[in-house]
C-alpha cells in the first residue's frame, strides 16, 4: 500500500493563483488625474470677479436695510416679472 505525501499544498492548490492575482490587482490600479483646461480656468476667474462685485452689492443692500433707507420699487419689480414671463 502506497501512501502519498499529504501537505498543505494539496489542500488548497488555488492559493498560489489567488496570491498572484492579489499582487497584480494592487499593482495595476491606476492613479486618478484631474486636468483643468485653460478655458475652464478663465471661466473660474470670471466667476470670481462677478462674485466679488455681487458681495459688494449685497453689503450695500444690507447697510440700506439696517439704516431704513432701502425702498422697494413695486413698479420696477412688476415690469421685470412681466418681461421674464413674456420671454418664456
Curated annotation (Swiss-Prot):
Which Pfam families would you find in this protein's record? FlgM
GO MF entry, a single one: sigma factor antagonist activity
Q: Which UniProt keywords apply?
A: Bacterial flagellum biogenesis, Repressor, Transcription, Transcription regulation
Is Methyltransferase included in the keywords of this UniProt record?
Answer: no
Q: Which domain of life is it from?
A: Bacteria
**GO BP field:** bacterial-type flagellum organization
Q: Which NCBIfam families match?
A: FlgM_jcvi
Task: Name the family.
Answer: Belongs to the FlgM family.
Q: What does this protein do?
A: Allows the coupling of early and late flagellar synthesis through the repression of RNA polymerase sigma-D factor-dependent transcription.
Name by which UniProt lists this protein: Negative regulator of flagellin synthesis
